[in-house]
């Protein structure tokens, strides 16, 4: 059974993700320690860079976008050793590297849909391998009890 804290932190990650101006993918991340929120982040352009959803082609948008995990790590401005991160989508390899490097010890993520796995399965496997090698615990949260 999922704890009330797990449900709350995942719901918060979803809420924070909804702040993204990206019309196709909204990702949220919440960093916690001992059931206290340390930082939050969502995917989007860096501060001061025009982020109108229709101004850039997809490839240019990808180059400019900070991922939710990156933003949460940057906004924290503190040591994240031993923290947990709650994400709406499984971290890409670049974000996995940053999570590992900061000392975050646990990643909580909802089970991924078949559609998501069909598009990102290879990158998910790379990230999972990185987390496993670095000793970062990954917990998959069942979708049906998160809502």
From Swiss-Prot:
GO BP annotations, alphabetical order: cytidine deamination; pyrimidine nucleotide metabolic process
Enzymatic class: hydrolase
Residues given in the record as Zn(2+) binding sites: 67, 92, 95
Signal peptide span: none
Pfam families given in the database record: dCMP_cyt_deam_1
Keyword Membrane among record annotations: no
Any one GO MF annotation of this record: dCMP deaminase activity
Coiled-coil blocks: none
Boundaries of every CMP/dCMP-type deaminase domain copy: 4-120
GO cellular component entries: cytoplasm
Similarity-based family: Belongs to the cytidine and deoxycytidylate deaminase family.
Name by which UniProt lists this protein: Uncharacterized deaminase in luxG 3'region
Upper taxonomic lineage: Bacteria, Pseudomonadati, Pseudomonadota, Gammaproteobacteria, Vibrionales
């Amino acid at each position: 059974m999922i704890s009330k804290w797990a449900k709350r932190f995942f719901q918060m990650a979803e809420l924070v993700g909804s702040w993204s101006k990206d019309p196709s993918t909204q990702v949220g991340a919440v960093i916690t320690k001992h059931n206290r929120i340390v930082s939050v982040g969502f995917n989007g352009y860096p501060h001061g860079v025009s982020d109108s959803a229709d101004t850039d082609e997809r490839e240019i948008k990808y180059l400019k976008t900070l991922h939710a995990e990156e933003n949460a790590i940057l906004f924290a401005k503190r040591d994240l050793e031993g923290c947990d991160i709650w994400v709406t989508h499984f971290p890409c390899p670049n974000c996995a590297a940053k999570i590992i490097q900061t000392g975050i010890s646990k990643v909580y993520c909802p089970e991924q849909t078949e559609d998501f796995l069909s598009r990102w399965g290879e990158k998910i496997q790379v990230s999972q391998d990185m987390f496993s090698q670095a000793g970062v615990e990954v917990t998959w949260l069942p979708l049906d009890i998160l809502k």
